[in-house]
């Protein structure tokens, strides 16, 4: 599992690592939904397109996670599989991808915790020892 929950006083914080920025976005989204439910219980039956942008990789990560979280909140979806189809840097960063999952079913999906929002607090994205590393905090 290429992420770990790290200590934070009132909220939940994660440190995520990957070989590429694309994989970093995927693993950050998996960590977010692993906090909400058991990923193994969520079947990737429906596909939702996700687009996000940011002036830098921190803003992009925030917008990516917030867009996925928004689809969870508004559509009642749980996601377990994510794919970045395109990541490009022009004037800023843009990502286009998909989140796969299914509608929340309380009989099948254990509820771990409610995530209110992804925050910018202590958020970072950087290269460390040849791999990409991100840290982020979610408001519970």
UniProtKB/Swiss-Prot annotation:
Q: Which UniProt keywords apply?
A: Calcium, Metal-binding, tRNA processing
GO process terms (BP): tRNA splicing, via endonucleolytic cleavage and ligation
Q: Which GO terms describe its molecular function?
A: calcium ion binding
Keyword tRNA processing carried by entry: yes
- Binding annotation for Ca(2+): 11, 139-140
Keyword Nucleotide-binding included in the entry's annotation? no
Do you know which InterPro entries this protein is assigned to? Archease (IPR002804), Archease_arc (IPR022952), Archease_dom (IPR023572), Archease_dom_sf (IPR036820)
The record's annotation in Pfam families points to: Archease (PF01951)
Function comment:
Activates the tRNA-splicing ligase complex by facilitating the enzymatic turnover of catalytic subunit RtcB. Acts by promoting the guanylylation of RtcB, a key intermediate step in tRNA ligation. Can also alter the NTP specificity of RtcB such that ATP, dGTP or ITP is used efficiently.
Instruction: State the family it belongs to.
Output: Belongs to the archease family.
Protein name in UniProt: Protein archease
Organism the protein comes from: Methanopyrus kandleri (strain AV19 / DSM 6324 / JCM 9639 / NBRC 100938)
């Amino acid at each position: 599992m290429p992420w770990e929950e790290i200590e934070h006083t009132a909220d939940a914080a994660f440190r995520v690592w990957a070989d590429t920025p694309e994989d970093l976005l995927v693993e950050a989204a998996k960590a977010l939904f692993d906090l909400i439910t058991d990923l193994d219980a969520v079947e990737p039956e429906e596909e939702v397109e996700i687009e996000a942008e940011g002036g830098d990789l921190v803003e992009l990560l925030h917008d990516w996670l917030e867009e996925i979280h928004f689809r969870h909140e508004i559509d009642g979806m749980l996601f377990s599989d994510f794919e970045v189809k395109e990541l490009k840097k022009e004037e800023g960063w843009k990502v286009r991808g998909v989140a796969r999952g299914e509608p929340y079913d309380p009989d099948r999906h254990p509820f771990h915790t409610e995530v209110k929002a992804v925050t910018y607090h202590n958020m970072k994205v950087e290269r460390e020892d040849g791999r990409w590393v991100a840290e982020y905090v979610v408001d519970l």
